[in-house]
Amino acid sequence: NHYNFEFLFVDDGSSDHTLDICRDLNLKDSRCNYISFSRNFGKEAAIYAGLEKSTGDYVAIMDADLQDPPALLPEMIKILVTENYDSVATRRVSRKGEPPVRSLFAHLFYKLINKISDIEIMDGARDYRLMSRKFVDSLLSLREYNRFSKGLFAWVGFKTKWIEFENVERVAGETKWSFWKLLFYSFDGITAF
């Protein structure tokens, strides 16, 4: 099967050459579009902006550092097209390559948020997922100011199939998620749910 598709890159105020690369891609291929923030507004704002500008029947969220394996997309598309799901989500089965303290805090975060919340957020869940248009529209209808996408994905209640994969090292660059930034993000997630 062949599908029409577009790439929508969200440049979250990067200080490298990301915007130049996005512009070049757009000039070479009109299916490559981009949104460029004036400064870093954070992951949640980038996800929301991308979803808001998306137009497809199916929409995938994935990190551009290739820690979310693009090779899973054909399987994800097949599941949404042939099975009765509105979302195919991914989770890492291991945190191989991560500092042990970071893995410990991530595990504790999921344990705590699932204990105090009415919804379950899968341990190891990534933002990498493929969603139907009705799933995306439902997310966009939530006018949360302080968004926590992993919680919102679960809260909207659509049928989701989970695919597991081994942790993948990033292809280039370094994470901007310091321990403190992750800690504050987890506080936001807990207070949002």
Residue ranges and their predicted role:
Residues 6, 31-33, 159-161:
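Conserved beta-strand segments of alpha/beta enzyme cores
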Residues 31, 35-39, 43-53, 58, ...:
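Acceptor/aglycone-binding surface of glycosyltransferases and processive sugar-polymer synthases
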Residues 25-29, 82, 193:
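Acidic-histidine catalytic/liganding microenvironments
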Residues 187, 191-193:
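Alpha-helical membrane-interface segments at transmembrane helix boundaries
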Residues 3-14, 35-36:
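Short beta-strand/loop segment that forms part of the nucleotide-sugar
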Residues 17, 21-24, 49, 75:
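Alpha-helical transmission elements in cytosolic ATPase-linked domains
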